């Protein structure tokens, strides 16, 4: 999907929800700038496009599409080495919602974004679906997953031994859970492959094999 198509879709949605057209243009420009930063290898505009495309397939299962859509766009708006990325991204989302003059229901987007910090959702079905959507890449094909793993590595300018140690810790936390995915919808479609992919990467990292 080209940037022009993304922009058209963004503006149409904001207009449909009664938002401010001028602010829609400004915020879209901000988001594109954030996601096309040269430091971004995985958490880029392609990641947003991937999530938007997949979300359309599950749209019938989403209760608050406005919040869901906004959360996709803003969930990685702030991406640096700090631990507060999710919180800062959620705050930026709320700022945009207020300036866009969107309905009160849009504020739920912030909670969806915050749920990605631990990828353990509350009882909210939308939150479960959203965190699963953010992790959908884990259940992708072997080739696609390896590309994702390499992109994640490229975002960290640290020695290999430090990256491997931290990455293994993160992946093993997911593998220690009863399920990687929160929703039945994603478990049925992606759980098995996600388990295979994560186990492969952990073993590769422990052996020092190139991803």
Region annotations inferred by a language model:
Residues 1-14, 36-43, 54-64, 101, ...:
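Divalent metal-dependent phosphate-bond-processing catalytic cores, especially two-metal-ion Mg2+/Mn2+ enzymes
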Residues 89-122:
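Histidine- and acidic-residue-rich, metal-dependent catalytic cores
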Residues 24-32, 45, 49, 69, ...:
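Short, well-structured alpha-helical segments
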Residues 7, 11, 25-29, 52, ...:
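An amphipathic alpha-helix signature
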Residues 62-72, 105-112, 126-129:
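Alpha-helical scaffolds flanking conserved acidic
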Residues 51, 65-80, 89, 112-117:
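His-Asp-centered metal-binding catalytic motifs of divalent-metal-dependent phosphohydrolases/nucleases
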Residues 33, 37, 71-74:
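Non-membrane alpha-helical segments in proteins
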Residues 37-47, 78-91:
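Active-site metal-coordination segments of metallo-dependent hydrolases
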